[in-house]
């Protein structure tokens, strides 16, 4: 029986999360309601037409108090107070909290009071019961104790799998992260007054140094690394796809081949669908729509003794939304008491993304474009 899910906040991540849920988890999950303050027609339009990922190929219909996606009707409400959202009426067992406003679990718990059993926050959180990065620490989830769960940030999901491989195989004494991150809606289109004078500047015209807690957050999912990492962000003029630039001092010397071999091995086994591996000379747009948390670039590994620098790509919107959908399915299976016969519940949920990890709609679109281009070149 599918677990019923509600979404609070239908912005960039909320919309991509719904697409990912519909692409990946219709057997485990039924999305029954969305709470958002914008009108239904606007939300349906923005779901259908996306500047980063193109036009949703299915049917989308806006109604007065719901919208219908591919024949599935989803109720829509508009409540400012999460405690006033009628989750109980809709039977929502899990709520995805993606407004960005209720990242403190003391506030997010209002969803529980409104009838939900579990809340998954699509951001780094405070006072949460547990932070989970799939592929790294999901085995620590206890459905009896953990009711408010953080999916961490897109950058923590991009770094943590890479850090885990390095830590498991070589040990890590300390590390520094720079995430070269696409701009987001929190930034300014043009210069405007702000207390943060860098954040005041036009996002599409500048490289903007900024803070990130992603490196420190790795210690939440790999406790042995608590306090060993620091980091910063460089916001750049691209609309999606970012890259982790991670420098670490290892416990022992390693070679480029050893590090790449370890990443390749994990990407094909315990982190299949989470960690990707490539030695292709890719650029950021090549990774748009990739469903994996982190795609390691073996071409760029640098080593000097026990000092290493590695790069790993991630689609900070769709890739993160896929993990958000996957962790929702993971929690849903726990609520239903489902276990895997061979213990590989994560592999069943995430699946094998294939070489590129593209979602089916984007993969089919790109294949069609490639076929058309080939045919044109022969004419």
Set out the residue ranges of the language-model regions.
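N-terminal Rossmann-like NAD(P) cofactor-binding subdomain of oxidoreductases
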Residues: 1-200, 302, 326, 334-338, ...
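C-terminal substrate-binding/catalytic lobe of Rossmann-fold NAD(P)-dependent oxidoreductases
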Residues: 4, 23-86, 171-174, 179-308, ...
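Alpha-helical scaffold segments in soluble metabolic enzymes
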Residues: 12, 16, 20, 110, ...
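Intrinsic structural disorder
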Residues: 36, 106, 117, 156-159, ...
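Alpha-helix N-cap/helix-start and coil->helix boundary motif
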Residues: 40, 126, 215, 317-318
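Structured loop/turn residues at secondary-structure junctions
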Residues: 99-100, 154, 210, 251, ...
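A generic structural signal for alpha-helix starts
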Residues: 157, 253-254, 318-319
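NAD(P)-dependent Rossmann-like dehydrogenase/reductase catalytic/cofactor-binding core
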Residues: 291-369, 373, 378-379
């Amino acid at each position: 029986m599918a677990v019923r899910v509600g979404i609070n906040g239908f912005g960039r991540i909320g919309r991509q999360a719904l697409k990912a849920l519909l692409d990946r988890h219709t057997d485990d999950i039924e999305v029954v309601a969305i709470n958002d303050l914008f009108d239904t027609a606007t939300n349906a339009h923005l779901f259908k037409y996306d500047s980063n990922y193109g036009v949703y190929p299915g049917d989308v219909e806006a109604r007065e108090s719901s919208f219908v996606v591919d024949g599935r009707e989803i109720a829509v409400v508009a409540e400012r107070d999460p405690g006033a959202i009628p989750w109980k009426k809709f039977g929502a067992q899990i709520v995805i909290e993606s407004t960005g406003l209720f990242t403190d679990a003391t506030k997010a718990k209002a969803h529980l009071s409104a009838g939900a059993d579990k809340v998954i926050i699509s951001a780094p959180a405070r006072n949460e019961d547990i932070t989970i990065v799939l592929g790294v620490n999901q085995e620590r989830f206890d459905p009896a104790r953990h009711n408010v769960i953080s999916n961490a940030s897109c950058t923590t999901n991009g770094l943590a799998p890479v850090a885990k491989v390095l830590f498991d195989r070589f040990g890590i004494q300390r590390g520094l992260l720079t995430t070269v991150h696409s701009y987001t809606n929190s930034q300014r289109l043009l210069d405007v007054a702000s207390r943060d004078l860098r954040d005041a500047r036009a996002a599409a015209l500048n490289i903007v140094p900024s803070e990130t807690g992603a490196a420190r957050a790795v210690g939440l999912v790999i406790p042995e690394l608590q306090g060993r990492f620091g980091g910063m962000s460089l916001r750049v003029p691209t609309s999606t796809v970012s890259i982790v630039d991670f420098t670490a001092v290892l416990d022992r010397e390693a070679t480029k081949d050893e590090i790449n071999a370890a990443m390749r091995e994990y990407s094909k086994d315990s982190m299949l669908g989470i960690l990707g591996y490539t030695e292709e000379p890719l650029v950021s747009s090549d990774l748009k729509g990739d469903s994996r948390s982190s795609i390691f670039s073996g071409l760029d590994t640098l080593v000097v003794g026990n000092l290493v620098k590695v790069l790993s790509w991630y689609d900070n919107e769709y890739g993160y939304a896929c993990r958000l959908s996957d962790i929702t399915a993971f929690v849903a299976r726990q609520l239903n008491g489902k276990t895997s016969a061979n213990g590989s519940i994560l592999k069943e949920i995430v699946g094998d993304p294939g070489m590129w990890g593209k979602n089916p709609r984007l993969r089919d679109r790109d294949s069609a474009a490639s076929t058309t281009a080939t045919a044109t070149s022969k004419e």
